[in-house]
From Swiss-Prot:
Top-level taxonomic group: Bacteria
Name the UniProt record assigns to this protein: Bacterial ISG15-like ubiquitin-like protein BilA
Function: Component of the Bil (bacterial ISG15-like) antiviral defense system, composed of BilA, BilB, BilC and BilD. The Bil system specifically conjugates a ubiquitin-like moiety (bilA) to the bacteriophage central tail fiber (CTF, or tip attachment protein J) via reactions involving E1 (bilD) and E2 (bilB). Modifies CTF of phage SECphi27 and SECphi4, which probably interferes with assembly of the phage tail. Also modifies T5 baseplate hub protein pb3 (gene D16), but not gp27 of phage T6 (Bil defends against T6). Expression of the Bil system in E.coli (strain MG1655) confers about 100-fold resistance to phage SECphi27, SECphi18, SECphi6, SECphi4 and T5, but not to SECphi17. When cells expressing the Bil system are infected by phage SECphi27 at low multiplicity of infection (0.03 MOI) the culture survives, at 3.0 MOI the culture collapses at the same time as cells without the Bil system.
Organism: Collimonas sp. (strain OK412)
Gene Ontology BP annotations: defense response to virus; protein modification by small protein conjugation
Stretches assigned to the Ubiquitin-like BIL-type domain: 4-80, 81-163
UniProt keyword Repeat, yes or no: yes
Repeat in keyword set: yes
Upper taxonomic lineage: Bacteria, Pseudomonadati, Pseudomonadota, Betaproteobacteria, Burkholderiales
PROSITE patterns hit by this protein: UBL_BIL
Cross-link Glycyl lysine isopeptide (Gly-Lys) (interchain with K-? in central tail fiber acceptor protein): where in chain: G163
UniProt keyword annotations, A-Z: Antiviral defense, Isopeptide bond, Repeat, Ubl conjugation pathway
Amino acid sequence: MTTLVVFIQVQGRPGIIETKLGPATTIGELKAALAAVGVNIDVETFIYVEDAENHLHGEHHEPAYGVKHGCRIHVSRCKRIRATVHYLDKTETRDFAPGARIRAVKAHAVDVFHIPPKDAGEHVLQLCNSLERPASDTPLHTLADHNTCAVCFDLVPEKRIEG
């Protein structure tokens, strides 16, 4: 019998939890595995696999679609994360799935703001009113405000070279 190792990230809780699941995990088995590692699931908590647009839902005996070896399971109180990006004098807001990564937000901003590829490669997302620049594989729910399900970024040059 093959076991699947999955990585759990919970909104409002730092770090990553590693756990093992069976090869054909059901929604009920996944919820039981989450409870076993101290992650409480209630009616206001949603489970996402990787960067899926929709949360897992259904009966306990139904398959937990998308669960595979090495995947990330995201547990969030937000169904969507509203990401706002400021670039120069422009602002763009869009809703993303909680498991969406920073790189998806940047890609959307680059497209909307019509930034050439060379310039896009020299810019990063920085949290508004801070100097923090999250890694491109950071899930949005780990940065979002828990009450508003929102996060704000500035698209800034990675390095500023003065001549």
